[in-house]
Amino acid sequence: MVFAIRIRQFHTTLVSAEKNGLQKLIPPRLKTIWNQMLVETKGAGNGPERFEMIRQKYKALTADEIQKYKNKLQEQFDAEKKRFMETLRSFTPTEIDSENRRRSKEAHSTGSRYYRLRHPDVPKKPSSAFILFYKELRNNPKLRQELGIPEAISTLVEETQNASKAWKELAEDKKKPFIDKSKALKEQYDKFMKEAGFR
């Protein structure tokens, strides 16, 4: 039973064997020197021998050699990321949204994690008035002092709760700048989406 569950978790959208290119699309990751050395020593001895070989090889690297490895891996990552973004652009935002919903549903049913795709040319959705207020609160000590919110908050949950309470108690004239800015950002977003043909 456990084996069956693991197979289901592996066969998620992130590694799907289906023909749909969007379903198989996963973002590149920046490889480590260890990853690269595993590739370079493929077929060289059994597991323990190979790992010891890599350990000794890494231990003997000079600072310049380590930097060369890092530069090479960064170049590979940049090239892979560029290809990834170009591939994403070949799909419409609607297709990507549909795929994200499918991934979410499948991940929920298997208990797996999934990567949410995002069209490179679509801007992030504008922040709500409360989120704009929350960001200002985090970066403005004077505002925190005015609202009686202490500087040091132990947890993010407590920080959010304090911000939510402060927002609810905030006078309407104090809320207005955040509400107006949120509306303006929403209008800009909607205009861009329409002009770009994403709606």
Curated annotation (Swiss-Prot):
PROSITE patterns to which the protein is assigned, alphabetical: HMG_BOX_2
One Pfam family cited in the UniProt record for this chain: HMG_box_2
GO cellular component terms given for this protein: mitochondrial nucleoid; mitochondrion; nucleus
Key word NADP present: no
Cellular location(s): Nucleus
DNA repair recorded as keyword: no
InterPro entries to which the protein is assigned, alphabetical: HMG_box_dom, HMG_box_dom_sf, HMGB
Keywords from the named record: DNA-binding, Nucleus
GO molecular function: DNA binding; mismatched DNA binding; mitochondrial promoter sequence-specific DNA binding; mitochondrial transcription factor activity; single cytosine insertion binding; thymine/thymine mispair binding
Chief site of localization: nucleus
SMART domains referenced in this protein's UniProt entry, alphabetically: HMG
Any GO BP: mitochondrial chromosome packaging
DNA-binding stretch(es), residue numbering of this chain: 123-197
Role of this protein: Binds to cytosines in base mismatches and opposite chemically altered guanines. May be involved in repair of DNA damage.
Subunit (UniProt): Monomer.
Protein name per its UniProtKB record: Cytosine-containing mismatch-binding protein 1
UniProt organism field: Schizosaccharomyces pombe (strain 972 / ATCC 24843) (Fission yeast)
